[in-house]
Swiss-Prot record:
Protein name: Salivary cystatin-L2
One GO term describing the cellular component: cytoplasm
UniProt source species: Ixodes scapularis (Black-legged tick)
Quaternary structure note: Monomer. Interacts (via loop 2) with mouse ANXA2; the interaction results in reduced activation of mouse NLRC4 inflammasome formation upon Anaplasma phagocytophilum infection.
Intracellular or extracellular location(s): Secreted
Source domain of life: Eukaryota
Keyword presence, Iron: no
Main location: secreted
Family designation: Belongs to the cystatin family.
PANTHER family per UniProt: CYSTATIN
Tissue expression notes: Detected in salivary gland and midgut.
Length: 132
């Protein structure tokens, strides 16, 4: 009886520790084509590119490569994207359906973190790119 209780305590404690390790960390999602993630990807890419000095065209999302989420007081979305300069000038309004990647534009791999609070308001926490 004592050894059974000890085993329950050991395995129960291990399960609690594993659960605590997951809390607060990012969890990978398998559905990169989910409309919510695509909307966030386009929001971050178009907003970020519009703020870059010297740019004349919006960047657009070519592909969502990876999605991770983290529950905080709201949700952090860490997205890894393939982006390229679009055919839409910054003087126009960005539209994900009409702002297609420029055929001659180099593609870059970017990672962005978007925070969405409990009221649904979103903001870009970071956006970093490297050559693809």
């Amino acid at each position: 009886m004592t050894s059974s209780l000890a085993l329950v305590l050991v395995f129960g404690g291990a399960a609690v520790c594993a659960e605590l390790a997951l809390r607060g960390g990012y969890r990978e999602r398998s559905n990169q084509d989910d409309p919510e993630y695509l909307e966030l990807a386009h929001y971050a890419t178009s907003t970020w590119s519009a703020q870059q000095p010297g740019k004349t065209h919006f960047d657009t999302v070519v592909e969502v490569l990876k999605v991770e989420t983290q529950t905080v007081a709201g949700t952090n979305y860490r997205l890894t994207l393939k982006v390229a300069e679009s055919t839409c000038e910054l003087t126009s309004t960005y539209n994900k359906d009409t702002c297609q990647a420029n055929a001659n534009a180099a593609q870059r791999t970017c990672t962005t973190v978007i925070y969405r609070n409990l009221q649904g308001e979103k903001s870009i926490s970071s956006f970093e790119c490297a050559a693809a």
